[in-house]
Curated annotation (Swiss-Prot):
Pfam families reported for this sequence: Ribosomal_S5 (PF00333), Ribosomal_S5_C (PF03719)
Biased composition (Low complexity): 12-28
GO CC terms of this entry: small ribosomal subunit
Name of the protein this chain belongs to: Small ribosomal subunit protein uS5
Recorded family membership: Belongs to the universal ribosomal protein uS5 family.
Organism: Synechococcus sp. (strain CC9902)
InterPro entries assigned: Ribosomal_Su5_D2-typ_SF, Ribosomal_uS5, Ribosomal_uS5_bac-type, Ribosomal_uS5_C, Ribosomal_uS5_N, Ribosomal_uS5_N_CS, Ribsml_uS5_D2-typ_fold_subgr
Compositionally biased region (Polar residues): 1-11
PROSITE patterns: RIBOSOMAL_S5, S5_DSRBD
Subunit architecture: Part of the 30S ribosomal subunit. Contacts proteins S4 and S8.
Length: 215
């Protein structure tokens, strides 16, 4: 008696019914060119964009003053806007920038970019104050800042207060001397903050121990 069942051919190409569904999906993705790699790369780009936005969002910007200024040229007077902007992250970094443009938005944008180019690192104590007394001068403006006890707050006014708050200082006393110009006062405050040193740095500069600083 002969066997009538069909014999399998090892050289035969398997049909669609013999291929698993997952393998068929992979083949279709390969035919379309690249599979899911493109989508994965796009997701990575989006995540990178969000990280960049998070870095930008930690910076705060405050406009101190916007003035309309003019420049005399050959054809007459050219009008523009000048913006004074303070930029800080409230974690010990702050900068003051000035921007000029034909419109207010452009002037503020340039002021923010200029402020980020002139950042100053401010040493903060555990009570969000400054380690020592300091003073700064810019033009005819002079600013004196001194540390304060916890709960005092920021005792300052005008552009000086804006600089101190965006630097992350929460307990400080400041006094303005001389000119009342917002730009000069803000820059004088920046000079005072840039000259601050921690107790450890002061002890190292003087060549004494840290215990002698506190004694």
């Amino acid at each position: 008696m002969t066997d009538s069942s069909p014999q399998s051919n090892p050289n035969a190409v398997p049909g669609a019914a013999d291929v698993p569904a997952a393998a068929q999906g992979q083949q279709q993705e390969q035919r379309r060119g690249g599979g899911g790699g493109g989508r994965g790369d796009r997701r990575g780009d989006r995540r990178g964009g969000r990280r960049g936005q998070d870095r930008d969002s930690e910076w705060q910007e405050r406009v101190v003053q916007i003035r309309r200024v003019s420049k005399t040229v050959k054809g007459g007077k050219k009008m523009s806007f000048r913006a004074i902007v303070v930029v800080g992250n409230e974690k010990g970094q702050v900068g003051v920038g000035v921007g000029k443009a034909g419109d207010v938005i452009g002037a503020v944008r340039k002021g923010v970019a200029d402020g980020k180019k002139h950042l100053v690192k401010v040493p903060l104590t555990r009570h969000s104050s400054i380690p020592t007394l300091s003073n700064g001068r810019d033009g005819a403006a002079s600013v004196l800042i001194r540390p304060a006890a916890p709960g005092t707050g920021v005792i300052a006014g005008g552009s000086i207060r804006t600089v101190l708050e965006l630097a992350g200082i929460k307990n400080v006393l400041a006094k303005r001397l001389g000119s009342k110009t917002p730009l000069n006062n803000a820059r004088a405050a920046m000079v005072a903050l840039s000259s601050l040193r921690t107790h450890k740095e002061t002890a190292k500069e003087r060549g004494i121990s840290l215990e002698q600083i506190y004694s």
